[in-house]
């Protein structure tokens, strides 16, 4: 059994004594996820005041939008955010020590006749966050929501014709980047259902929505055109090799003044290999400036350390069962940021490490961080992750890391990890709490 200290350095424990919860569902969500959240804030160097603020926001404004607490066999809304349909995921920028989390807003109407495709809760969630954080602007939120998610008539068409028989129905999610005491809000759109309803591909819907936006905000046109040219060349060559095709999967933007907001287009790469990563990074050889090549050297180093298996892969159509141990590998992912008045889009590549050994991934990341001047995070990272799941056999786990992302700008690497966030810390902390991921637990907690 782990002898690690309680995650959160006391902030989680103190708030747990203070908080009242309107339902047992929200109480379970708090005790399942807040220990890891608190520990991440502490390890990333947030002041104790900022830790209290962000955890309080999480309890008050986020947990009410997470829906029923997931247990095996219980009917619930499944979110594309994680492979087992959990609607919440913590992430950590290891090089900037910035904590983030993403969630798909859910409420009691989600999945019912009143809102079969979960279109509405995100509106209420955004409005609540806009009341407590200055600078949130909803212009681009409204634009992309109209362009990429179902309207009422389209939703009715899908239900009446039973066109939607697949499990994956997520249309949008929100993410908060926590910056000292404040947060920056981002939105992500998945137009898969819109594609089924309209007959237009997800790829077309995403690129068409950005094209129309660029007619009004022409400063993003150079980068957008460069991306279009690259994707067109790749997809034309897919007639010879089908695995070379790039498919747009989702889009995100910052919910701030449109004059400052960034648009990011996410593409799925079916070929998992170093040459494929290099092609994504350089836009097929079009980005060859000194900074790009410095970043490419680090990308190659990270690839070597992580030892991601190669192959031609497709994304699964359904979800894993809650508590199921993964035996799969996923395609790679890349996003391109369209900066204003920049002739080239900026890449961020994602290593899909879900299903790989978490101890080995932690060791690889530690080495990378040590080599590049992030000794403090290198020292803390593995300990933090082990302490977040103290009753598990850490050496055997293979589902804590879902993604490792990498970008390079202003002459430094940006490395982030996306982490399984469920039943963390000393779970269960309340009697008769469910235990879902128990395959690698070190002890029987039934008497504790």
From Swiss-Prot:
Q: Which reaction does it catalyse?
A: L-tryptophan + dimethylallyl diphosphate = 4-(3-methylbut-2-enyl)-L-tryptophan + diphosphate
Name the pathway. Alkaloid biosynthesis; ergot alkaloid biosynthesis
Going by the record, the broad EC class of this enzyme is transferase
Q: Supply the EC number(s).
A: 2.5.1.34
- Pfam families cross-referenced by the UniProt entry: Trp_DMAT
Mind telling me which InterPro entries this protein's record contains?
Aro_prenylTrfase, Aro_prenylTrfase_DMATS, DMATS-type_fun, Trp_dimethylallylTrfase
User: Which key words tag this protein in UniProt?
Assistant: Alkaloid metabolism, Transferase
GO MF annotation terms:
tryptophan dimethylallyltransferase activity
Q: Which residues bind L-tryptophan?
A: 80-81, 89, 190, 249
Cite the record's note on assembly. Answer: Homodimer.
The free-text function statement in the UniProt record for this protein reads: Catalyzes the first step of ergot alkaloid biosynthesis. Ergot alkaloids, which are produced by endophyte fungi, can enhance plant host fitness, but also cause livestock toxicosis to host plants.
Give the family, as the similarity comment puts it: Belongs to the tryptophan dimethylallyltransferase family.
Q: What is this protein called?
A: Tryptophan dimethylallyltransferase 2
Give the source species: Claviceps purpurea (strain 20.1) (Ergot fungus)
